[in-house]
């Protein structure tokens, strides 16, 4: 098992230490052990979760929804986790549809300046 400090976890995930600490406060991550000095230690599963949470956040999934999923996973609540995964899948599908619509609108946009723009001062 690899043991990660907050700073090493952040570095390996490509995020700031502040993001890791924020995710800890929100319950998205939790240490698997503590040093004698009281610092949290994390394992490979925490790194994988951090990468997942960050990717989901970057894709537009809110941290509150992700926190509900993480809490259900941490509580070994299979039904709760399944329900939260279903909610996230619905959000992803809505995002996918919105992006497809946006792509069609972008494709239909003219690339030339409007003709009436020539008459503007």
Swiss-Prot record:
InterPro entries: DNA-bd_dom_put_sf, MerD, MerR-type_HTH_dom, MerR_fam. Pfam families: MerR_1. GO terms for molecular function: DNA binding; DNA-binding transcription factor activity. SMART domains: HTH_MERR. The keyword DNA-binding applies. PANTHER family: HTH MERR-TYPE DOMAIN-CONTAINING PROTEIN, REDOX-CYCLING DRUG-SENSING TRANSCRIPTIONAL ACTIVATOR SOXR. Residues 3-72 form the HTH merR-type domain. GO terms for biological process: negative regulation of DNA-templated transcription; response to mercury ion. Transmembrane segments: none annotated. This is HTH-type transcriptional regulator MerD. Residues 6-25 bind DNA. Keywords: DNA-binding, Mercuric resistance, Plasmid, Transcription, Transcription regulation.
């Amino acid at each position: 098992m690899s043991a990660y400090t907050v700073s090493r976890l952040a570095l390996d995930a490509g995020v700031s230490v502040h993001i890791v600490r924020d995710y800890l406060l929100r319950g998205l991550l939790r240490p698997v052990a503590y040093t004698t000095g009281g610092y949290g230690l994390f394992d490979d599963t925490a790194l994988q979760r951090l990468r997942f949470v960050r990717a989901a956040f970057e894709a537009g999934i809110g941290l509150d929804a992700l926190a509900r999923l993480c809490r259900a996973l941490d509580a070994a609540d299979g039904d709760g986790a399944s329900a939260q995964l279903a909610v996230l899948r619905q959000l992803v599908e809505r995002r996918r549809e919105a992006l497809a619509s946006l792509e069609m609108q972008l494709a239909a946009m003219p690339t030339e300046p409007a003709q009436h723009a020539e008459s503007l001062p």
